[in-house]
């Protein structure tokens, strides 16, 4: 049996994706930060085996997707998703959900992607998992498109630079000169892994402060703990990164050394900027396209309106987009010429 259904509305409202198989869709579940209680995997398995085709897809946005859902089974699947909504959205992320058996409420604000952060990774400066969960209620449920990626250090393993909103954990360093033995380990690490802003002078490490990106490689390399991260969790914000057929580009630096409170205020204003640029209609466009449409100065004024910046914060005066060869393809010639 097959039924007629507006799959576009089902996608926008309940996270169902159209399948090339007639009469079928794929449901995906939100996992902010990509970490979930292990027992919820059995819930996903049961959905896949009971109503799907027995398979689970690990999506590029750290979600679990179950293909092969028949249209007539959508209500049953929505009800079966209750543990995900209750344990992740409500209990872990503090999202207000009135009916946990009605399925997901929107797809606009995409699942927040994150690396494992400093709960696991020694290179990470910040707690990406915690931030992902605290930001979830600001991006979901919303009909307006926003792709967010959070990483714990400038290594950017999860590709925050390719997201509408890329959030990168950075750290201010504390240097205790009396502990420095002049071994040069930090200088070598910074030169090899980072930006080369350290040098040895009179047997002690010195830093060119303006060049430091706050990655923390010096902290990992120092055998005497002369370099240590300051306890404040700070972030860098990049905007406008995207893949896509229409002018793919790497995101540009917008804010540096900002606090979590600043990021929360910025996200609220990002959605207001989207609404203004789209005339109140949640049309699918990347943030970079909207910045192009409105201009950076207009964007900056709207997004920073009412935001209380912390003393360390830095703001990009302008952003310059340099398109790559993906559009013109002027460097390509027929083979053999």
Swiss-Prot record:
It is found in: Cytoplasm. [4Fe-4S] cluster 2 binds at residues 180, 183, 186, 222. It catalyses: hydrogen sulfide + 3 NAD(+) + 3 H2O = sulfite + 3 NADH + 4 H(+). Residues 171-200, 203-232 form the 4Fe-4S ferredoxin-type domain. [4Fe-4S] cluster 3 binds at residues 190, 212, 215, 218. The keyword Iron applies. Binds 3 [4Fe-4S] clusters per subunit. GO terms for molecular function: 4 iron, 4 sulfur cluster binding; heme binding; metal ion binding; oxidoreductase activity. GO terms for cellular component: cytoplasm. Pathway: Sulfur metabolism; sulfite reduction. The anaerobic sulfite reductase seems to consist of three subunits. This is Anaerobic sulfite reductase subunit C. The gene is asrC.
């Amino acid at each position: 049996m097959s039924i007629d259904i507006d799959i576009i509305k089902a996608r926008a409202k309940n996270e169902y994706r159209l399948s090339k198989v007639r009469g079928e869709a794929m449901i995906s579940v939100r996992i902010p930060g990509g970490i979930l209680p292990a027992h919820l995997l059995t819930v996903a398995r049961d959905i896949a085996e009971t109503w799907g085709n027995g398979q689970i897809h690990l999506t590029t946005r750290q979600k679990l997707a179950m293909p092969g859902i028949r249209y007539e089974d959508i209500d049953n699947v929505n009800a079966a998703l209750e543990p995900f909504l209750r344990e992740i959205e409500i209990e872990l992320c503090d999202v207000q959900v009135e009916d946990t058996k009605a399925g997901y409420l929107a797809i606009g604000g995409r699942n927040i992607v994150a690396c494992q952060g400093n709960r696991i990774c020694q290179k990470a400066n910040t707690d990406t998992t915690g931030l992902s969960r605290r930001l979830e209620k600001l991006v979901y449920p919303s009909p307006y498109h926003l792709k967010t990626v959070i990483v714990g250090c400038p290594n950017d393993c999860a590709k925050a630079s390719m997201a509408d909103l890329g959030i990168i954990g950075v750290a201010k360093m504390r240097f205790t000169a009396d502990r420095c033995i002049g071994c040069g380990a930090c200088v070598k690490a910074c030169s090899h892994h980072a930006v080369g802003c350290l040098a040895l002078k009179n047997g002690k490490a010195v830093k060119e402060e303006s060049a430091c990106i706050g990655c923390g490689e010096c902290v990992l390399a120092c055998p005497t703990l002369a370099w240590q991260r300051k306890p404040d969790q700070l972030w860098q914000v990049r905007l406008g990164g995207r893949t896509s057929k229409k002018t793919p580009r790497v995101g540009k630096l917008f804010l540096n050394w900002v606090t979590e409170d600043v990021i929360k205020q910025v996200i609220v204003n990002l959605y207001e900027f989207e609404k203004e640029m789209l005339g109140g209609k949640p049309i699918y466009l990347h943030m970079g396209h909207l910045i192009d449409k409105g201009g950076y100065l207009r964007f900056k004024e709207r997004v920073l309106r009412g935001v209380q910046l912390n003393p360390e914060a830095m703001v990009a005066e302008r952003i310059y987009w340099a398109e790559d060869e993906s559009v013109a393809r002027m460097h390509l010639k027929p083979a053999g010429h």
